[in-house]
């Protein structure tokens, strides 16, 4: 959890926002996935948000669903994902690493065992996409027991009671959703969300990072200008992977260029 605090303090001193890319572990193969993560970090990613392949990712649009299918086709298992996470942490001791999960994957070997494994491989946070705050007690208790930040989604229509609960129970960062629906760069984020950012700050919530539909530098600039601590981009990044499956070197160079541009937009 401390890695997020250190990151946000450092960026605040530099008057920068955070840029956080999302990719699915093992897409399109374990070997290429690790090269992709190296590239994201080299291009300026401030933290990582990583998905573990799941057969029914309800919160995700077709782009990220296809990433899950590619990882499955490559034979990626949850066990392999934890091996990859351990390798990433060993190579990058300071970068915050977050997981975006679904409850069935957390339940499969027991909630406590899951968070213990996360702690062992150096994961900082876990967002369980299909568990709302009101149903999260067992998850967040296990997370905190193992020093893992429980992350909660703040929807654009959140009422005051929900904002207070998110502020009370969330750690690390708050996932501020730009719009209703599933992930996807083809549906643009609804910007800005100044009123929600102001309320979250008033209630001392973990710093808000805005995601869903963030696909160009202008949106990152608007997000940071609204007072959010930064932006998360997934589908736009996964689309670059999808477009270049047969050209792995082109894939990496396009990812580097995209992430560099998005990170630069956090500085304006």
Curated annotation (Swiss-Prot):
It catalyses: (1S,2R)-1-C-(indol-3-yl)glycerol 3-phosphate + L-serine = D-glyceraldehyde 3-phosphate + L-tryptophan + H2O. GO terms for cellular component: cytosol. Its EC number is 4.2.1.20. Keywords: Amino-acid biosynthesis, Aromatic amino acid biosynthesis, Lyase, Tryptophan biosynthesis. The active site is at 49 (proton acceptor), 60 (proton acceptor). Pathway: Amino-acid biosynthesis; L-tryptophan biosynthesis; L-tryptophan from chorismate: step 5/5. InterPro entries: Aldolase_TIM, RibuloseP-bd_barrel, Trp_synthase_alpha_AS, Trp_synthase_suA. GO terms for molecular function: tryptophan synthase activity. It holds the Pfam family Trp_syntA. It comes from the Bacteria. The alpha subunit is responsible for the aldol cleavage of indoleglycerol phosphate to indole and glyceraldehyde 3-phosphate. NCBIfam families: trpA (TIGR00262). PANTHER family: TRYPTOPHAN SYNTHASE ALPHA CHAIN, CHLOROPLASTIC, TRYPTOPHAN SYNTHASE, ALPHA CHAIN. Belongs to the TrpA family. Tetramer of two alpha and two beta chains. This is Tryptophan synthase alpha chain. It comes from Pectobacterium atrosepticum (strain SCRI 1043 / ATCC BAA-672) (Erwinia carotovora subsp. atroseptica). The lineage of its organism: Bacteria, Pseudomonadati, Pseudomonadota, Gammaproteobacteria, Enterobacterales. The gene is trpA.
């Amino acid at each position: 959890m401390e890695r997020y605090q250190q990151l946000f303090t450092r960026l605040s001193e530099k008057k920068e926002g955070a840029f956080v890319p999302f990719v699915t572990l093992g897409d399109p193969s374990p070997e290429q996935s690790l090269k992709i993560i190296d590239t994201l970090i080299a291009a300026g990613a401030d933290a990582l948000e990583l998905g573990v392949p799941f057969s029914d990712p309800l919160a995700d649009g077709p782009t990220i669903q296809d990433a899950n299918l590619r990882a499955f086709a490559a034979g990626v298992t949850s066990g392999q994902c934890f091996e990859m996470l351990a390798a990433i942490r060993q190579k990058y001791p300071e970068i915050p690493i977050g997981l975006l999960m679904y409850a069935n994957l957390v339940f499969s070997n027991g909630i406590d065992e899951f968070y213990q494994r996360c702690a062992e491989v150096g994961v900082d946070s876990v967002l369980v996409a299909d568990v709302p705050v009101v149903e999260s007690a067992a998850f967040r208790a296990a997370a905190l027991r193992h020093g893992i930040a429980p992350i909660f989604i703040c929807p654009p229509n959140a009422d005051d009671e929900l904002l207070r609960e998110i502020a009370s129970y969330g750690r690390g960062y708050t996932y501020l959703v730009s719009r209703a629906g599933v992930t996807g760069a083809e549906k643009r984020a609804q910007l800005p969300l100044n009123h929600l950012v102001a309320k979250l700050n008033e209630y001392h919530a973990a710093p808000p990072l805005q995601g869903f539909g963030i696909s160009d530098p202008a949106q990152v600039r608007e997000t940071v200008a609204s007072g959010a601590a930064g932006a998360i981009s997934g589908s736009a990044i996964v689309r670059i992977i999808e477009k270049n499956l047969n050209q792995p070197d082109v894939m990496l160079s396009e990812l580097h260029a995209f992430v560099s541009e998005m990170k630069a937009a956090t500085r304006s």
